[in-house]
């Protein structure tokens, strides 16, 4: 049960950090004519 909790915390933390960096800096991926 603890493994599931730790995994959830790890994934959520990485997600928050990823979105924070992603929204702080504009994405540097070339736009191929589509959203």
UniProtKB/Swiss-Prot annotation:
Keyword vocabulary terms for this entry: Chloroplast, Membrane, Photosynthesis, Photosystem II, Plastid, Thylakoid, Transmembrane, Transmembrane helix
Coiled coil (UniProt feature): none
Pfam families assigned: PsbT
GO CC terms, sorted: chloroplast thylakoid membrane; photosystem II reaction center
Sequence intervals crossing the membrane: 3-23
GO biological process, one term: photosynthesis
InterPro entries (alphabetical): PSII_PsbT (IPR001743), PSII_PsbT_sf (IPR037268)
Compartments, record wording: Plastid, Chloroplast thylakoid membrane
Membrane topology term: Single-pass membrane protein
Functional description taken from the UniProt entry: Found at the monomer-monomer interface of the photosystem II (PS II) dimer, plays a role in assembly and dimerization of PSII. PSII is a light-driven water plastoquinone oxidoreductase, using light energy to abstract electrons from H(2)O, generating a proton gradient subsequently used for ATP formation.
Subunit structure: PSII is composed of 1 copy each of membrane proteins PsbA, PsbB, PsbC, PsbD, PsbE, PsbF, PsbH, PsbI, PsbJ, PsbK, PsbL, PsbM, PsbT, PsbY, PsbZ, Psb30/Ycf12, at least 3 peripheral proteins of the oxygen-evolving complex and a large number of cofactors. It forms dimeric complexes.
Similarity field: Belongs to the PsbT family.
Name this protein carries in UniProt: Photosystem II reaction center protein T
Organism this protein belongs to: Cryptomeria japonica
Lineage: Eukaryota, Viridiplantae, Streptophyta, Embryophyta, Tracheophyta
Gene assigned in the entry: psbT
């Amino acid at each position: 049960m603890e493994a599931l909790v730790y995994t959830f915390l790890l994934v959520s933390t990485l997600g928050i950090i990823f979105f924070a960096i992603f929204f702080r800096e504009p994405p540097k991926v070339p736009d191929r004519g589509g959203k």
